[in-house]
């Protein structure tokens, strides 16, 4: 299909679309059947996103417009148009339940920021390029005032709606006072910074809700169920995920997410349950085992009788917990808000008294000018912006100023084990030859040959080990997967077995006393043993372990030295493994075999005891605890989307040492903010009464007012250059 053909289609009675523009990797398409239909907008986004080379796609149901950003080198534009045609015929019940991506962008907010930036730029050019006076002429002042009112409208509306002397009233008073005294530049600068902060905070919340919604619906829009009655009993049919009911027999194929909680009634499989337990190593399940929605069948096929569906599944409860925890988070009462509650009404009273007693309008204007809390409004956002920029350069992504404040106060930290205190991917620790004709290198080489086509993490670890040792992997003729046990391979005319001790027992391979002692020893050390047999004879053993991060012990020691009183390790692993890891790291408190609800309970319990709690994790199962903690920290942007979106801080480079930097930066940011408030409040408070006494002229008041703002910005800028130890 060419662009010309697409334009011809638009003239037909079929679902129409017109390519409005297509240049420089950006295509805009007008689709009439998307207009006023958010669900169809989602369909188009889903269809186009599957095309190779497409980077971002936004569908706007208000206008019927779709904007696609793509790579001109990698993307076939005809496939985009074909995807749109196909999206027109998707059944309504198969459309994912979510909002269009364009809902993350509110044009009016972007417009306010853009107009504010443009106005500040023009005022700067006027003052410093054309050397014009500070005071604006009438026409320019009217335009600037209009821009100020437009950019400050949300705050003005909030102050009028709630009628309280909070943040909105603080900003509104500053805006009105600045307009009266012709301080348009100050008003615009403050409003522009605050608009950016409000926009980013709102955007983060919307993205979090979208990530959580995607988690609940999963990647599966449909499920296969087996009919149990009627003339078609035994037939497997595909149905929308929303129509699956409790008691249905759900068929789950390889590499597909399990859509329901339930009991396995037929089949065997290796299942990755990391979305629930947080543990990367898959487990074997068979008839009688209980499985959870969100788990993925790595290998095999299962028949599951549904016991919970939708929001009532374990993964659904995780979503609910996250949403509740986010809503329960108490708002932090900043110094600026507390100051405004007292100072703003006081300034009005003092100015009114001054006017009543002196009848001097200029003195009253001086009081309002010196009382204008613009410097107080700048105290936090400038420091936070500098600190966040400093952290970003070091791979610390902080989502808001309140989280910086909490980072410096944390005195209890919870760690998820897998992927946080440990590396999160198993490595080979021992290779033992148990036959005189076999060397450890041969054992590893042929073991890798057996695992070469497997996607199991243990298999990947064995193969990585051969690459690290530069050992060639011999070919094999045929292989067979023994679900839950291991692999059977035929190579060089011999039969190779690699797997658990249970596999060798089932195949009647004799396991020597030495090998049994090795197995017991390794399990006690939290390592996984794989036995290797050739033609019915045990010839070697390989053990694997999820290694503790090399920096973990030192980081924990430094955290204790910095004032952290409680460190607790949480894991879904067996108690023996948890105990061994905790002992190695010197952790006295740990919880094993915990579910997401249990992690959340530990957070709540510590908070009830009076601790400021930090939670460090990287998985979906950590999300409720990350949201409920006073500060949630996601380890690595490679972690799950929900963990990263829910957390208050994300560590991009996956290094535990960054935890120390978060704490250090948070403490330093709080110090700077306090200094800013001290300076600005002192100037406002002293200036209020000095101005009322007539010791200041409006010009001096304006100079003092601007000087306090400059001092606050200069003090905050020190955070940009602050060096973390």
From Swiss-Prot:
Localization of this protein: Cell membrane
Record's signal peptide: none
Gene Ontology biological-process entries: copper ion homeostasis
TM segment ranges: 101-119, 142-160, 165-179, 188-202, 335-359, 365-383, 669-688, 698-717
EC nos: 7.2.2.22
Tagged with keyword Cell membrane: yes
Described function: High affinity, slow turnover Mn(2+) transporting ATPase.
The protein, known as: Manganese-exporting P-type ATPase
Native species: Mycobacterium leprae (strain TN)
């Amino acid at each position: 299909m060419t662009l010309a053909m697409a334009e011809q289609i638009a003239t037909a009675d079929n679902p129409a679309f017109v390519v409005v523009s297509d240049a420089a990797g950006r295509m805009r398409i007008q689709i009439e059947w998307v207009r006023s239909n958010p669900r169809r907008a989602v369909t188009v986004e889903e269809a186009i996103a599957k095309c190779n080379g497409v980077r971002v796609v936004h569908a706007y149901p208000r206008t019927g417009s779709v904007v696609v950003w793509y790579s001109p080198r990698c993307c076939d534009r005809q496939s985009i148009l074909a995807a749109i045609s196909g999206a027109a015929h998707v059944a309504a019940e198969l459309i994912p339940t979510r909002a269009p991506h364009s809902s993350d962008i509110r044009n009016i907010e972007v417009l306010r920021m853009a107009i504010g930036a443009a106005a500040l730029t023009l005022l700067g050019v006027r003052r410093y390029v054309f050397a014009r006076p500070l005071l604006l002429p009438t026409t320019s002042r009217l335009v600037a005032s209009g821009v100020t009112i437009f950019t400050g409208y949300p705050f003005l509306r909030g102050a009028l709606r709630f009628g309280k002397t909070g943040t909105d009233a603080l900003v509104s008073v500053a805006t009105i006072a600045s307009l009266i005294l012709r301080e348009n530049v100050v008003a615009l600068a403050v409003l522009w910074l605050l608009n950016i902060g409000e926009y980013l905070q709102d955007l983060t919340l919307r993205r979090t809700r979208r990530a959580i919604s995607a988690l609940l619906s999963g990647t599966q829009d449909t499920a296969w169920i087996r009919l149990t009655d009627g003339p078609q009993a035994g037939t497997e049919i595909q149905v929308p995920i929303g129509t699956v009911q409790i008691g249905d027999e759900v068929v789950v194929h390889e590499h597909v997410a399990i859509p329901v909680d339930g009991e396995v009634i037929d089949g065997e499989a290796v299942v990755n349950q990391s979305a629930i337990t947080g543990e990367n190593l898959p487990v074997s399940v068979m008839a009688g085992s209980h499985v959870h929605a969100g788990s993925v069948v790595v290998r095999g096929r299962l028949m599951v009788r549904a016991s919970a569906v939708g929001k009532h599944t374990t993964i659904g409860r995780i979503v609910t917990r996250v949403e509740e925890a986010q809503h329960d988070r108490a708002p932090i009462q900043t110094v600026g808000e507390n100051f405004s509650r007292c100072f703003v009404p006081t300034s009005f009273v003092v100015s009114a008294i001054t006017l009543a007693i002196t009848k001097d309008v200029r003195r009253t204007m001086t009081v309002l000018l010196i009382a204008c809390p613009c410097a107080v409004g700048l105290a936090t956002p400038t420091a936070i912006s500098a600190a966040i920029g400093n952290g970003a350069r070091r791979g610390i992504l902080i989502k808001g100023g309140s989280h910086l404040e909490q980072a410096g106060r944390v005195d209890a930290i919870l760690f998820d084990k897998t992927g946080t205190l440990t590396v999160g991917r198993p490595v080979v620790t021992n290779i033992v030859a148990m036959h005189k004709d076999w060397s450890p290198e041969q054992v590893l080489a042929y073991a890798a040959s057996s695992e070469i086509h497997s996607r199991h993490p243990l298999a990947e670890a064995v193969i990585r080990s051969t690459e690290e040792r530069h050992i060639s992997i011999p070919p094999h003729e045929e292989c067979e997967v023994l679900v839950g046990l291991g692999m059977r391979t035929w190579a060089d005319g011999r039969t190779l077995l690699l797997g658990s001790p249970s596999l060798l027992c089932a195949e009647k391979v004799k396991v020597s006393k030495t090998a049994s002692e090795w197995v017991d020893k390794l399990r006690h050390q939290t390592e996984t043993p794989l036995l290797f047999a050739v033609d019915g004879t045990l010839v070697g053993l390989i053990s694997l372990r999820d290694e503790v991060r090399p920096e973990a012990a030192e980081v924990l020691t430094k955290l204790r030295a910095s004032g952290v009183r409680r460190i607790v390790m949480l894991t879904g692993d067996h108690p023996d493994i948890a105990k061994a890891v905790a002992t190695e790291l010197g952790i006295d408190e740990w919880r094993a075999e915990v579910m997401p609800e249990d992690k959340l309970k530990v957070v709540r319990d510590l908070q009830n005891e009076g601790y400021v709690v930090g939670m460090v994790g990287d998985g979906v199962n950590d999300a409720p605890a990350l949201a409920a903690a006073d500060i949630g920290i996601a380890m690595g942007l490679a972690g799950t989307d929900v963990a990263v979106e829910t957390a208050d801080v994300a560590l991009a480079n996956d290094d535990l040492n960054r935890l120390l930097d978060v704490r250090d930066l948070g403490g330093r940011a709080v110090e700077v903010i306090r200094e800013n408030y001290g300076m600005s409040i002192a100037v406002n408070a002293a200036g209020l009464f000095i101005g009322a006494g007539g010791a200041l002229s409006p010009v001096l008041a304006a100079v003092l007012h601007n000087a306090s703002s400059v001092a606050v910005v200069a003090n905050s800028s020190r955070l940009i250059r602050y060096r973390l130890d």
